[in-house]
Amino acid sequence: MKRILVLGMALLLTAVAFAQNNVTRFMGIPIDGTKSAMIQKLKAKGFTYNANEDELSGEFNGKDVYIRVVTNRNKVYRIFVSDAVGSTEGNIKVNFNRLCRQFAQNDKYIPQNVFGEYEIGDDEDISYEMSVHNKRYQAAYYQISEADKDTTGFTQWAIEKAMAKYTEEEMQNLTEQEVQHFKIELLMDYMNEKMSHKSVWFMITERFGRYYIYIFYDNELNHANGEDL
């Protein structure tokens, strides 16, 4: 039991707990509510709405972009951001890697991949890989906020998970390598349980020989979950 408690406390120092009533935000705006209300809030941020195309345009993160508001059952669940101007293959790699570094250095995000390794190598032929192997270049993160940093109950959660997997004797006999592996496993489980509804991810897409980055700010709590089936 002592080792389980120590493990729980060690994880407590590095983990972040997430309240379920918090939702993903785009430029500080909660991704929730009606589409019309969201459009008005984005217009207040300086974006211009085109009713014919049902999209907004403006500048975001130093680039000209188009923005679409996506809903499910009249509730916003996604903000979709697209480059307004396409790039060459070489430039899109630079842009993608720069975006990866910006997310990595921003304390509002943690990578969904525990290692956070998303950048594209200099020698990567993305045109070939995408067209021949259907390779997808994507990076995904969980969004956090100061309000999320509530570790209440985390130690008990970690203890219950540990006791469900190991007996006290087995826990005492784990090697340090096994303990470290289990800590990573617990952290990933915790992130999936507490953060998966606050996903921000981006990918490269190709259209007519030009490359674009799509960014998705998702509130999975409002996403379709088969209720209409």
Residue ranges and their predicted role:
Residues 42-82:
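N-terminal, post-signal-peptide region of Sec/Tat-exported proteins
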